[in-house]
Amino acid sequence: MSIYLIALLPVLGWGFMPIIANLRKSTPEEQLLGTSISALLFALILFWILSPEITVLSFIVSFISGIFWSFGQLLQFKGIAASSVAKAMPISNGTQLVGATLFAVLVFREWQTVTAVIIGVVAVILILIGVVMTGFQKRGNHITESVSFHVYGIVILSSFFLTLYVVTNQLFDVTGFSIILPQAIGMLTCAIGINLAKKTAISRKNVTFNLMTGLSWSIANLGMFLATAVLGVATSFSISQACVIVATIGGILIFKQKKSPLEWTFILSGILLIMVGVVFLSLLK
């Protein structure tokens, strides 16, 4: 039972992360810097406790994956700033799932049977339909897509980098807790570079506030590591993706966004389709 509670940490951590980041009027760059600082502090504590062996290869690969994360997370924050948590996060989660799936198929050749291909294609279609449905909005007597192509573009590009962040270590077979510290160093290095390149003053208060954003992300990341070790990739992966429920519904309720019954129907149906797609994908892992 306790391991399933640990498996819920990614659900809550990744679900509340974008909500926490947007509780205060911070720029995406400030959100990224605060998150990265907190992630590095958390990684240093874990390194001190666990003392994992870090090789030159694992350091370089994990450092690069951290850079990919920074670009992806910055764009995700920008996508949220241009829309809302409830609108951007289903797109982000869904397109990351599709991106990771395509990478697994094209690079790792994971779908070797006709059955696997059918299940995988159905899963991807369900996820994409679910993503679009969560963005529907009632205007008069009509239901229209409320998310602009501009926001879709930002979030999809974000998902491209976040997918690279996820698969880079897998590509070089770098696993375990040795990933966390060099990855966090890469995250912070890139975040500092992004803020320096912006050449505008940052708010220390905003950066400090977003240490909580980083803590939420770090706890989720640790929970995912622990759950995967015991439950396996398929189960822990499926559970963790429920973070889209927390982010979407939590974003609507906490930021007091008014939704009509019809809009709620589309949002909840879209989330359900995404989760069904996730379950189908987990069958292939």
UniProtKB/Swiss-Prot annotation:
Highest taxon, organism lineage: Bacteria
InterPro entries in the record: Sugar_transport
Keywords recorded for this protein, A-Z: Cell membrane, Membrane, Sugar transport, Transmembrane, Transmembrane helix, Transport
One Pfam entry name: Sugar_transport
Subcellular location(s) of the protein: Cell membrane
Membrane topology: Multi-pass membrane protein
Claim: Cytoplasm is one of the keywords in the record: no
Gene Ontology molecular function: carbohydrate transmembrane transporter activity
One GO term describing the cellular component: plasma membrane
Membrane spanning residue stretches: 2-21, 31-50, 55-77, 111-133, 146-168, 172-194, 207-229, 233-255, 262-284
Protein family membership: Belongs to the GRP transporter (TC 2.A.7.5) family.
Protein's recorded name: Putative sugar uptake protein lmo0424
